[in-house]
Amino acid sequence: MLRLLRSSWARGLGSGVATWRPSAGLFRPGCPGIRQASGASDTPHHQSPSSESPVQPVGVGVCSMMRLPLQSSPEGLDAAFIGVPLDTGTSNRPGARFGPCRIREESLMLGAVNPSTGALPFQSLRVADLGNVNVNLYNLQDSCLLIREAYQNVLAAGCIPLTLGGDQTITYPILQAVAKEHGPVGLVHVGAHTNTTDKPREEKVYHRTPFRRSVDEGLLDSKRVVQIGIRGSSRTLDPYRYSRSQGFRVVLAEDCWMKSLVPLMAEVRQQMGGKPLYISFAIDALDPAYAPGTGTPEIAGLTPSQALEIIRGCQGLNVVGCDLVEVSPPYDLSGNTALLAANLLFEMLCALPKVTTV
């Protein structure tokens, strides 16, 4: 059973401190500096606290994803938001370790229903925030082991993880856990880079290698892998050739320019069928005009509306896990990148199986 690594939280300058009982474990509270709201407990809610307290101003209460209850265990949950504050696998600009906290902060303004799709996730699923995986920032290999162990426990409880990254490295140990539970899975990967590099500088694990390592270990059903938004210069064509040689469908960003992606997603739905599917969304898929706060930006990317079309196009599929990675708050001065990330994670929640619509 997983436990939050609990500590003292402060509401702000000059305020009292709400003390958490110390407990060793794989998870820790998601966003320090905010006091836990009175009455919060481990009991999961069907309804988002955002809608239960519509007059509560932003910045007051629990600093959790959408003000959901913080829970120390995945038991009894259908889905959970989990932060993985890791960026030691980054090759360019760091800062993704701060992504989970910033995304949670921007999520405080989100509502509980999706008027565009009619999805009612909190009336359909039991959802909570499990805090952050207690990674080891000094040892990437150890962090991967900790992530895999944490997600194995979450998945064994029948809970679908929705992950706040962190750099793309984290997808590899998450897929290890997902494949252990579900077998090889299909993948909808949205990002600027294929992340199928082999071993630059003899490093097998970092944010450009997760899907190559996943193929090596048989974690993916390669005939059901789609990569959307790929673009930018490259030192070699090997990653592109490798993806296609494995049977991945690679959709370049140029093939998405100035068009709706609804027809593409209709084809993807046919390709995925009813088998388990994992969604991995790197925020660098979006053009840096919309999402500048990322470690490895590339020009001429997707638009937010296309991102919505991709995620909404997965609604009704057998989604068994999702992640949103590569948000780097130090390069996100306006907060717009984290705001986009929070909204896309909400859309992923709305696309999960068993979510009812009106």
Swiss-Prot record:
Gene3D superfamilies: Ureohydrolase domain. The keyword Hydrolase applies. CDD domains: Agmatinase_PAH (cd11592). SUPFAM superfamilies: Arginase/deacetylase. The keyword Cell inner membrane does not apply. Signal peptide: none annotated. Residues 31-56 are annotated as: Disordered. Mn(2+) 2 binds at residues 193, 284. It is found in: Mitochondrion. Belongs to the arginase family. Agmatinase subfamily. This is Guanidino acid hydrolase, mitochondrial. The lineage of its organism: Eukaryota, Metazoa, Chordata, Craniata, Vertebrata.
